[in-house]
């Protein structure tokens, strides 16, 4: 159970009593909170620190969200984001969670069950004990890691499908539940798929792996009424719509990037972002750890990287960095939520902070002044000096040793002052140094001309799908993560009056974030070469976790759906309705979000306890 409603979702997290290390330079969160719905101004008034157009949007959104939750609308089986692959509703099979419910699990499923119980206990007030048994009982939630295929009957694809009659299948249901009917095909759930069955007697989540169980548990969370996000007990009927969902991801890599180099974000903020990713079945968090303005990860063999390079940020703001234990904590927290951390050490450019700390790495061997602006392309490590490669080997070696995931991101973008031949030679050596650690090289698509190393992944952030160099790299064996700047860059403004963000790649409203196909975006790149999608958030103008959330929501779930859901489920009109229904959940959970006028936000009525927003509302940079 959460004891701090504004804290990340912890559940029974492994005990860690260490205080935040003063050397981490973590910036204490602001104690100011976002305006409550009750304190919002009347039309024509403004919010402190927010320009009038943005204040009006905030007022409208808060007025809509002020209480859409007291009499929550019924949730339909397909009202889930990302859209499930196959849905077979059974209106006669609705289940109601009650105070005597028990989560019955096999031992391998206990951790997922404990997390699920932790999500549900505050709002329901139910004890929801977890029992190590798969023997069912009345009003029981059952999770099993076994991938049990059942005969396929009526198959329904897409979230708007309606059920058909099918043959009964005996056995395996919670005692007191109606027999499960054959429905969508659950063969081949893979590493992350799951099957969720809801009957009048209980809920069963079936998967082949804990990750699949976790994704199924997140789906169940969305199938409960929106007040389930409340930090205090709410007297509503905790109904779950009946039927069957069979679901698996379209792409294996689904992620978001948080730039902690331009502005530093304390560990607790990063953990909160992990929770947001996990909620929408994103499974990778890319941390942009180094840039001109700051170096954010401790490297024992090069201590001045953080002691000196970690002291600055954009706009002369306070710097900060993660100690090794800080980083381990982030990695472990993410892993428990089936999110893999992808660390980025940006090379050879974007290195001013490193050069301030170690001028021998600079081409002129003179320390540049610290940089707190937002220009790019002026800094680089000396590709002709052997000390540079000793530095790279030490840094990637230490970061790789702290990172259990398979990836290490080398950056590689915007090294404008490095001659092309020197750039290719540097990247070739740096890639081999990463490969020597056992990690798979990831880099921005500017790495494309360099020699290929086995497994190499390019992250494509262009705005024009015609990219012959990237297509050639794919022909040589590279795979792609799609992050098109004009669709997936979440630091772009929603509209001209958005109070924070950029517009160099255009404005990205929710529809633009949703309406593109990763499998067909770069010409000459076949669908099978696309590993997945990632939504980057650069933070030159983003300074608090509330501002991070404002830029993530509601666009992050749009990119998440592109990565998870089958192409045939993609439909803007249906998506916007499903996405708008998330608004009351975000309000109750204390998540700051942009009240996009594109979405039909539900009508609201007051009355549900909400979690406080973590810091402040967005302000102009």
Language model region names:
Residues 189-377, 389, 397-400, 404-407:
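Feature activates predominantly on carbohydrate-active enzymes
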Residues 261, 290-294, 344-350, 413-415, ...:
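Active-site beta-loop-alpha junctions enriched in small/polar residues
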Residues 125, 451-456, 461-621:
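Flexible, acidic glycine-rich loops studded with aromatic residues
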Residues 103, 209, 256, 277, ...:
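Conserved, mostly hydrophobic/aromatic
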Residues 2-28, 37-249, 400, 441-448, ...:
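Acidic, contiguous N-terminal accessory segments
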Residues 359-360, 364-457, 461-472, 476-477:
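Active-site neighborhood of glycoside hydrolase catalytic domains
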């Amino acid at each position: 159970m959460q004891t701090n409603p504004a804290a990340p979702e912890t559940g029974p997290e492994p005990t860690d009593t260490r205080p935040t290390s003063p050397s981490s330079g973590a910036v204490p969160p602001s104690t100011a909170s976002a305006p409550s719905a009750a304190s919002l101004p009347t039309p024509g008034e403004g919010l402190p620190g927010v320009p009038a157009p943005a204040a009006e949007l905030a007022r409208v959104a808060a007025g809509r969200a002020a209480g859409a939750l007291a009499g929550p609308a019924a949730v339909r089986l397909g009202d889930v984001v990302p859209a499930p692959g196959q849905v077979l509703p059974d209106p006669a099979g609705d289940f109601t969670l009650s105070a005597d419910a028990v989560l019955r699990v096999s031992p391998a499923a206990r951790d997922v069950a404990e997390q699920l119980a932790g999500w549900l206990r505050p709002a329901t007030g139910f004890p929801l004990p977890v029992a190590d048994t798969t023997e069912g009982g009345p009003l029981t939630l059952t999770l099993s890691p076994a991938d049990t295929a059942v005969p396929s009957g009526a198959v329904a694809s897409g979230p708007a499908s309606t059920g058909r009659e099918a043959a009964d299948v005996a056995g395996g249901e919670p005692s007191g539940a109606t027999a499960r009917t054959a429905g969508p095909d659950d063969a081949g759930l893979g590493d992350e798929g799951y099957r969720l069955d809801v009957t009048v007697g209980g809920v069963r989540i079936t998967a082949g792996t804990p990750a699949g169980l976790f994704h199924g548990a997140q789906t169940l969370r969305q199938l409960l009424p929106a007040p389930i996000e409340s930090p205090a007990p709410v007297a509503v009927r905790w109904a779950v719509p009946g039927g069957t969902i069979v679901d698996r991801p379209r792409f294996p890599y689904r992620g978001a990037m948080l730039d902690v180099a331009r502005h530093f974000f304390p560990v607790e903020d990063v953990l909160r972002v992990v929770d947001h990713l996990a909620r929408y079945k994103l499974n990778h968090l890319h941390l942009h750890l180094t840039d001109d303005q700051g170096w954010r990860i401790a490297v024992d063999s090069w201590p001045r990287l953080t002691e000196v390079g970690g002291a600055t940020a954009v706009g002369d703001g306070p710097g900060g960095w993660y100690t090794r234990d800080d980083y381990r904590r982030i990695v472990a927290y993410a892993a428990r939520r089936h999110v893999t951390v992808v660390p980025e050490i940006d090379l050879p450019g974007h290195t001013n902070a490193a050069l301030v700390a170690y001028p021998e790495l600079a081409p002129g061997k003179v320390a540049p002044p610290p940089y707190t602006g937002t220009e790019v392309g002026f800094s680089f490590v000396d590709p002709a000096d052997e000390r540079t490669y000793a530095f790279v080997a030490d840094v990637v070696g230490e970061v790789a040793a702290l990172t259990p995931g398979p990836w290490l991101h080398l950056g590689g973008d915007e090294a404008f002052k490095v001659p092309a031949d020197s750039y290719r030679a540097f990247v070739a050596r740096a890639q081999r140094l990463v490969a020597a650690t056992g990690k798979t090289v990831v880099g921005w698509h500017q790495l494309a001309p360099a020699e290929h190393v086995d497994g190499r992944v390019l992250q494509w952030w262009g705005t024009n799908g015609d990219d012959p160099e990237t297509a050639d790299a794919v022909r040589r064996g590279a795979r792609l993560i799609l992050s098109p700047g004009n669709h997936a860059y979440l630091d772009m403004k929603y509209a001209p009056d958005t109070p924070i963000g950029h517009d160099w790649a255009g404005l990205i409203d929710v529809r633009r974030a949703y309406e593109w196909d990763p499998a067909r975006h770069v010409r000459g790149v076949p669908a099978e070469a696309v590993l997945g999608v990632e939504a980057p958030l650069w933070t030159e103008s983003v300074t608090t976790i509330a501002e991070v959330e404002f830029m993530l929501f509601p666009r992050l779930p749009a990119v998440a759906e592109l990565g998870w859901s089958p192409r045939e489920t993609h439909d803007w009109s249906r998506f916007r309705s499903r996405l708008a229904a998330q608004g009351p959940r975000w309000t109750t959970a204390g998540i700051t979000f942009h009240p996009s006028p594109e979405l039909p936000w539900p009508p609201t009525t007051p009355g549900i306890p909400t979690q406080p927003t973590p810091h402040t509302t967005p302000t102009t940079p």
